[in-house]
Amino acid sequence: MRQNKRELIQAVFHNEKADRIPVGFWHHFLQDEVGADAFSHPQLTEKALEGQADFYQAFEPDMIKIMTDGFFGYPHPLLQKAVDSPKELMAITPLGRESEWFAAQIRYARKLVSIYGKETPLFYNLFAVPRTIEFMQAGIGHPVNLSDWLKQEPNKLAHVLDVISDDYAELSKALVEEAKVDGIYLSVNNISCDEVTEEAYRTIIAPYEQKILEAANRVGGENILHICGYHGFHNHLSWYREYPFLAVNWAAKVEGVSLSEGKKLFQGKAVIGGFGQTEKDLIYSGTEEAIKAETRRLLDEAGRIGVVLGADCTIPRDTPVSHLKWVREAANE
């Protein structure tokens, strides 16, 4: 009997033989996924749910990344105004389990699990705390350079990250334990590829990202690390080799690091991706012949164990679903 989607992803994430190659693509559903505030405007959650439903019906993905459009923020009063230094955040305290920030996300995840979870594994998107701070400050017209914070006030920044990541760790645990998602999909990046040293990142940033993954691991989460290369952002991938995840997705096209190279870099962990994610890339603009040829090339290069075919990051909203189906067809000829 052929593996169902749950058995398929379980096998791939553990580098076991699978009946076929799974395919996982995703895109945003709200027009302003970063600035949208579903905590204050819960109707946005319904729009996101409708978007997930339409995409699932059209494509029937082998795994679902729960898109958290509207939930990018951390609605703490201290972060909802312009901040110029981490010392302005030293009084920050966790929002806690009783907050709407916490409860709304559990409700949202539970709803999706109740609809799709019986047959398809779901992974809840969370952003690491530095990315959340950047999103929130940019959203009020006050972009911040966290690499400056890291250089000028490292201990104060560490304190802020520690406090907020406590909330994210508790949320990740509850998403797995209570909402019954299969794992979290944690999005990280280097903050600044050129301005931040590896030592500073490992000391000040990494512990509070790893904390989130570790919390989900403790309750059985099968977790994914996403090293975000959106808009061509470059990362030092090796900085994440020791993070506690089962599968990893990075911007293979942007970084110039193939799936097989990434598999070696990340010590044999399962890999997700292969295709670029912009309107200039093949998955959006390619012909059936070209997309199928690239699918075969990716698998010839990466092998068929521990591989999920997908993209560097979210694909454009209007990517033809037929293009995604061509990948699945070619992968399983």
Can you name each region flagged by the protein language model?
Residues 1-80, 107-114, 202, 206, ...:
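N-terminal basic, low-complexity leaders that serve as flexible interaction/assembly modules and, when applicable
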Residues 63-86, 90-98, 182-199, 312-319:
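Glycine-rich, proline-tolerant flexible connector loops at the mouths of alpha/beta enzymes
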Residues 76-174, 202:
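Active-site-proximal, glycine-rich beta->alpha crossover segments in alpha/beta enzymes
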Residues 169-184, 210, 300-301:
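Alpha/beta enzyme core
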Residues 8-18, 32-35, 210, 214-333:
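Catalytic-face loop-and-helix region of soluble metabolic enzyme cores
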Residues 35-47, 146-170, 223-227, 279-290:
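Active-site mouth loops of central-metabolism enzymes
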